[in-house]
Amino acid sequence: MLPELGTFLLVLALLVALVQAVVPLAGAQRGRSSWMAVARPAALVQLALIAAAFAVLTHAFLVQDFSVRYVAENSNSLLPVMYRYSAVWGAHEGSLLLWTLVLALWTGAVAIWSRQLPAHVIARVLGVMAVVSIGFLAFLLFTSNPFARLFPVPLEGGDLNPLLQDPGLIIHPPMLYCGYVGFAVPFAFAIAALLEGRMDARWLRWTRPWTNIAWSMLTVGIALGSWWAYYELGWGGWWFWDPVENASFMPWLVGTALLHSQAVTEKRGSFASWTLLLAIAAFALSLLGTFLVRSGVLTSVHSFAADPARGLFILVFLLAVVGGSLLLYALRAPRLSLGDDPRRAFAGSSRETLLLLNNLLLTCACAMVLLGTLYPLLADALGLGKLSVGPPYFGTLFVVLMAPLVALLPFGPLTRWQREQASRPLALLAPWAALALAAGVLAWFAAPQGHWKAALGVAGAAWVLLGTVRFLWTRRAAKGRKFTAEMLGMVLAHLGVAVFLSGALLVEALSLQREVALAPGQQVQIGRYALHFDTVEELRGPNYVSDRANLQVFKDDAPVGVLHAEKRRYASGGQTLTEAAIRPGPFGDLYVALGEPLGNQAWAVRVHLKPFVRWIWLGALLMALGGLVTAADRRFRRSPEIQDG
């Protein structure tokens, strides 16, 4: 009876969400405080119901209840217990339930930590979030019920996709969803402000830490996905411009613009329309990512099985939410009351102008990724044939758009609000620009064949790093040791950009790769490393059989270790999977992947040397840490002193 209980809990959650959406919004419109007061307890009850339903599904996986169709399709008696947990969200129905749970968690958190906001504001915010919950709960119950029964009950289940049987995939989807769904908070605030007809900059102070936390979680989620693809797929790459990778990257780009736009609106009263539109766009792109993953319209290693009914449901929901939000924005934004604030005017040479350029470049980059992702689909629909858009398009245009952004980045913190003499930040940064340029020239000559990406990566990273150092020096000279958490968070995030930039471009410029046939006793040379192919042995895991190659590693003729690369064959389904062997290091990885057997005891072996690849993920973690440090600023924890009404 537990599966039926799970369905019943979701039905109750849908009913509570309907109450949470209708009653508080109507109360805010009519000024009924008792109706508005329903929002908080309804949000917490909805969270409890969805969490209980999620616990029921988790229990079904742990006890291997194959009478539940979703469990029977994605688990079996050989699946290790650790992966039974990740199997809960390993396919369509469970991942959608996880999304709904994460949305309920964000809604509950807003209900608990928003006591300082006026009742009519929080009623509208929680009401809007409930509308989104209604859509996902209805989607679950009518097209994707994870508790649907299967009769007759099979004696054995299917299997979780072997690609997902990995510790990284236990963390990656929940973290990614926390980022995706977290943008529902600024989205709900934007819709609430449009419904209200005015936006107090002090309200915006309340939303900024929520946006920073969501953006940080999305950053970590994307980085975890990149790390997983690097070591699990056996290609040695860290980003493939896969459609679903792009689907998570687009809200990150718009979310980055939103972070900066919110700061301007809160501090200076400018960019209000930008901030509202970016808040809508960030969440709309998160919903678009959901559509791409679950509709089957795009091919991806991340996609779930195609289902036209599900795809149509999500598309209608997406159009309703996004179309309704943009219509409301078009009708209300031009008349939005912001009050009189002399700080809103700014000159062409000012920090506001630089941040406006930041917004434009990031949104253009997002539009470029969106076009490249959807163009093959549109071309096919219009009868133009099957087309593909690959890394050459994304890589070239992205560098063109990101280069000016990196060039402008150090100027922002050193430029004054409202009006600035252009010569001042130029004079402050000129010596540092010369040093960065010199570093790039040195990298050009040091790299094999003078690779331009090595020069660009070193020069760009040095420019951002030295510009950040110059800002800290200037700030300390002017203010002593006074640094707010918001400022330290900005510094960490900008340093993360420098580290990421150097890692991403250097690994592309300096990587080495060899594909060879090796038999026991043979060796291959790559860079300063020699790998001696010793033996291949057969091993048995809990639900797979593995051919494991043992390779002795020598660096400059000195032994430094042994690598074990595997080829696994899973018992259920017979799928074969490559498990790469990696010798990590702060300045580069030695990466070995075992290919197919070639006969006469020989195997195809791919060997990569990946300089500075780990700097990519270190940079992403620094950016995420910067967002969390900013969210912890004491200023955001003080009451915004907003008067009700």
Question: Regions from the language model: what does each represent?
Answer:
Residues 1-9, 31-37, 59-93, 145-173, ...:
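Membrane-interface interhelical loops and short amphipathic "cap" helices
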Residues 516-606:
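Soluble non-transmembrane domains of integral membrane proteins
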Residues 45-61, 129-141, 278-286, 358-370, ...:
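Hydrophobic alpha-helical membrane-insertion segments
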Residues 11-28, 32, 95-226:
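A conserved hydrophobic secondary-structure block that centers on an alpha-helix together
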Residues 29-50, 112-133, 195-216, 240-241, ...:
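Membrane-interfacial loop-to-helix junctions in multi-pass inner-membrane proteins
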Residues 50-73, 77-79, 86-111, 139-149, ...:
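Transmembrane-helix bundle segments that line or gate the permeation/cavity pathway
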Residues 1-33, 50-52, 66, 243-251, ...:
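Contiguous transmembrane helix-bundle modules in multi-pass membrane proteins
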Residues 174, 181-191, 203-261, 274, ...:
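Extended, hydrophobic alpha-helical segments in both membrane/secreted and soluble proteins
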